[in-house]
Amino acid sequence: MELQLEHLSKTYGTVQALKDISYTFKPGIYGILGANGAGKSTMINLITDNVARDKGSAGGSILYDGQDILKLGSRFRGIIGYMPQQQGFYEDFSPKAFLRYMAEIKGIKGKNEKGQTVKEQIDELLEVVNLTGVAYKKIGGFSGGMKQRVLLAQALLGDPDILILDEPTAGLDPKERIAIRNYIAELSRNKIILFATHVVSDRMYS
């Protein structure tokens, strides 16, 4: 399993956000550390195909196991799990309803490799992010940290090979931050995890 960036570049008008980035990611955790505006989110948006690359060879390429992600189409959506830094919610949705909704959007059906139904996967993820007790509460009343945990759970739906996490511990208290970091560290044994942050301590895993 490999994710390759080859001469990746991105410009917005006259501003060069990324220039000639090349790297090969294999299973493990990779911290993308930088100040706000350093290009972390731009790189993530290119990998998740939420932003178009520069035209032609100037934009470079992104390959998953040797294939350009643009040619993988919808298949790549099942390979990647993305937790954005911010996302709008239907405020009347509960975490459980939101995760069911996201599972449908991602086309997650039937049972996974562990034999779990979608409902069982959702229940397990809610436990992982410590939201079981508020599984049926409206997200509109949640704190910023609780909303972050809902977003992390949706990124993990379907057990993707690649996890892209943009500021995943923002808004969490120290205890929650450590718990989430440790869980992500466990997942990294057989996943490629890109972890964008401006918090230096988030590079440290036990």
Description of each model-found segment:
Residues A35-G39:
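Walker A (P-loop) phosphate-binding loop of ABC-type ATPase nucleotide-binding domains
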Residues T48-D49:
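Helix-to-loop junction immediately C-terminal to a conserved catalytic motif
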Residues G56-K71, R75-F76:
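Conserved ABC transporter NBD signature motif
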Residues R100, E104-G107, K111-V134:
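Conserved ABC ATPase "signature" region
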Residues L152:
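Hydrophobic anchor residue at the start of the ABC signature
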Residues L163-D166:
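Catalytic Walker B motif of ABC-type/P-loop ATPase nucleotide-binding domains
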